[in-house]
């Protein structure tokens, strides 16, 4: 469960290292984001020479959370960190590589490019 002021690791090579969630998209009453949801973030730390700079406001999709995600078959999956991938307005990632595993729930939200770039889909 990701909410406002949550800090996320960046799971791509866009140049950002850490994000701060400004807003969870999807309605005025929406408080929490889970895997596959889009959030508006501020870049809190970045690598020099990257595609995004510190202070930039970007959109990102959540790819990993420490909160267990329940599946239809009764199993749960959770990760060691909260991570996101910075995306453009057309849902394609800004970076060209994805680090770490992602879940197959991203396929239902049409993030096919992220799934194809990821080294492992759980």
From Swiss-Prot:
It comes from the Bacteria. Signal peptide: none annotated. Keywords: Ribonucleoprotein, Ribosomal protein, RNA-binding, rRNA-binding. Coiled coil: none annotated. One of its GO terms (biological process) is translation. The keyword rRNA-binding applies. The keyword Zinc-finger does not apply. PROSITE patterns: RIBOSOMAL_L14. SUPFAM superfamilies: Ribosomal protein L14. One of its GO terms (cellular component) is cytosolic large ribosomal subunit. Pfam families: Ribosomal_L14 (PF00238). This is Large ribosomal subunit protein uL14. It comes from Finegoldia magna (strain ATCC 29328 / DSM 20472 / WAL 2508) (Peptostreptococcus magnus).
